[in-house]
Amino acid sequence: MLASIFSLNVLQTALELGCIYALVALALFLSYSILNIADLSTDGCFTLGCAVACQVALTGRPILALVAAMAAGVCSGFVTAFLQTRLGVESIMAGIIVNTGLYTINLAVMGFSSTMSLVKTDTVFSLAKGSLSFLGGWYKLAIALAMILLAGAAMLGFLGTRLGLSIRATGDNAAMVRASSINPAFTITVGLCISGALCALSGGLLAQYQKSCDINVGTGMVTIALASLIIGETLLGKRTMLRRIIGVVFGSCLYRFIVAVALRFNVPAAAMKLVSAIIVAIAISMPAIKEKVAFEQRKHGACRRRVTTGKEGK
C-alpha cells in the first residue's frame, strides 16, 4: 500500500509540478515578502501567461511563447503598480481590479473559448526530449528544474544589486527610501513587473507541460503560492536570501507532493479544494504553533529549574 502511494512516479510528478509552480511562489516572494504588497492579481496573471503561451506555441514557436508570456506578465504587473503608485488605489483593491479585468482579457486571448489544446503542437518539452533522451522519462523534470534554477539565481543576483537593494528597502520602509532620494513608485513598479513576469512564465510553462490551457487554471494560485512560501520559510528559515529562495522551491515541491499523495488516497477531485485549504491553513499557522510550543517548553523548563532550586535550598 505504502509502496504504491510513495512511488517514484508520484515523486517525479510532484517535483515537476513543484518546480513549475515554484516560479509563482518566487513571484509572490518578491511582491509579498520583499515588497510587502498583497498582489491578488496572481490568479489572472498566471492564466494570462498560460493563454498567451498557448497562442504563440500554436504558431510553432514554443520558446518564443515563454518570452511572450513573460512580456504579458510584465504588462499585468505594470498595470497593478500603476493603479497603486499613480492612482492611489490600495494594493489589495488594485490586485482585485486587475484580476477581474484579466478574466475578460484571457478569454479574448483564448479566442473566447474556455479551453485550448496543444496536443498536436511542439512544446519546449517535446523539442528537448531528443537532446535529453539519456535522462529517459526525467527530461521534463530537467527542463523545469533548469527554469527554476535560472530564475532563482537571477532573483538572488538581482536582489544583491543597487536596484534590488532599493526594492528590499522599499518593502521595509518606504519613507526611508523616499528620504534617500529614491522614488518608491519606481521600485514598486519594477518589483511588480518582475513578479508578473515570473507568474506568467509559470503559467506558460504549465501550458506546455500539460499541453492545454483552461480559463480557470489560475484559480486559487495565490493561496497555493502563499502556502509554498510559508512552508519553505517555516522549515528552512529566512536567515539569508539564498535560504529563503531555496525554501520557496522546497515548499512548492513539498506542497505538490502532499497533493499527489492525497490523490493517491483516492480523494475525490471535488474535495481537492478542501485539501488545499487545509494545507494552506496548516502552513500559515505553523509559525504560531512553533512559537507556542517553544514558549511552553521554556515555561516548563523554568518550572523545573525552580523546583530543583527549591529542593537544593532545603
Q: Where are the model-predicted features located?
A:
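Membrane-interfacial amphipathic/re-entrant helices at transmembrane-helix boundaries
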Residues: 1-24, 52, 58-64, 129-141
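Cytosolic-side transmembrane-helix boundaries in multi-pass membrane proteins
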Residues: 6, 154, 172-179, 183-186, ...
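Transmembrane alpha-helical segments in multi-pass inner-membrane proteins
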Residues: 199, 203-274
